[in-house]
């Protein structure tokens, strides 16, 4: 009900965020959603700070962002699964660019393995990249936001953080953890009177990026695989409207509501109906 009311309100927002002058840091900016979000923000007067381990891809994002109108773009090599490197690069950003005012945590990975195929190291590394990286970046950049009671935390979670999915136990666990983390941080900020700091949690279905490895939906009318450019436009719009949740497509809303009262067997039947296991096997089973 809250999500429905929030979306109705966001159709007619009282105000929209102005991006001019914001310092926006994006993790995982070399390709996919992170790259497209950077390109969408480029003409809006922001300073872009791009973090990725793919140096060439990140340089290309920077070039395209400047081509799109960005006047200030800073590129950093950062392995977000490495705590020391995150804090080291965060110090550099503060000294060379300034305090980050919009933090977009987007770096992530999806292995697409079954639970018994995943090694302990697989689980640890997925949690480091997808979840712990967001803890470390929030710890690095949130204090400055708190000091001035202004800022925006944007976390790319997933519909998989709301629904446990086939061949994605490590991924689902990490994305569910992100949702819990960001809801908790938002609660603490609110009750401490720091209501100028906004939070947006992004929960998409599959998006056509390297991460999805050619995943194809068997029921595209209900569960489309979004183009990254379209997804990025929705994300930027959600930030502009200061939405707390962006869940897409609408069918994910329905499933989230249904699992709270339907028998588990019915949920599994719905998974079979949309042929999700078959889609995952086709995309990841051959790896």
For the regions a language model picked out, list residue spans one by one.
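Active-site helix of classical SDR
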Residues: 138, 174
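Canonical Rossmann dinucleotide-binding motif of NAD(H)/NADP(H)-dependent dehydrogenases/reductases
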Residues: 10-49
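The beta1-alpha1 cofactor-binding region of Rossmann-like NAD(H)/NADP(H)-dependent oxidoreductases
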Residues: 55-56, 76-88, 120
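Residue(s) in the substrate-gating loop at a strand-loop-helix junction
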Residues: 158
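SDR active-site lid
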Residues: 188-252
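Conserved glycine-rich Rossmann-like NAD(P)H-binding loop of the short-chain dehydrogenase/reductase
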Residues: 46-60
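Substrate-binding pocket helix/loop in short-chain dehydrogenase/reductase
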Residues: 114-115, 119-124
């Amino acid at each position: 009900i809250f999500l429905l009311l929030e979306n109705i309100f966001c159709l007619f927002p009282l105000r929209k965020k102005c991006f001019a002058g914001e310092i926006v840091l994006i993790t995982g900016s070399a390709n996919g959603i992170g790259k497209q979000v950077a390109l969408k923000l480029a003409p809006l007067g922001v300073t872009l700070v791009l973090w990725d381990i793919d140096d060439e891809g990140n340089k290309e994002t920077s070039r395209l962002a400047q081509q799109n109108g960005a006047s200030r773009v800073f590129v950093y090599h950062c392995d977000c699964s490495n705590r020391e490197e995150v804090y080291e690069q965060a110090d550099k950003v503060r000294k060379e660019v300034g305090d980050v005012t919009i933090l977009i945590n987007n770096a992530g990975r999806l292995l697409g393995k079954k639970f018994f195929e995943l090694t302990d190291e697989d689980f640890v590394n997925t949690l480091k990249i997808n979840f712990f990286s967001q803890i470390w970046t929030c710890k690095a950049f949130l204090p400055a936001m708190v000091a001035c009671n202004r800022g925006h935390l944007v976390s790319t979670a997933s519909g998989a953080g709301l629904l446990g999915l086939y061949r994605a136990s490590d991924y689902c666990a990490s994305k569910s953890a992100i949702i819990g983390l960001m809801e908790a941080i938002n609660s603490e900020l609110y009750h401490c009177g720091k209501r100028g700091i906004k939070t947006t949690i992004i929960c998409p279905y599959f998006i056509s990026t390297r991460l999805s490895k050619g995943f194809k939906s068997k029921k595209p009318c209900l569960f489309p695989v979004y183009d990254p450019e379209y997804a990025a436009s929705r994300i930027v719009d959600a930030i502009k409207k200061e939405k707390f949740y962006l869940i897409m497509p609408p069918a994910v809303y329905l499933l989230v509501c249904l699992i709270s009262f339907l028998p588990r067997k019915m949920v599994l039947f719905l998974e079979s109906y949309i042929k999700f296991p078959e889609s995952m096997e086709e995309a990841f089973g051959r790896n």
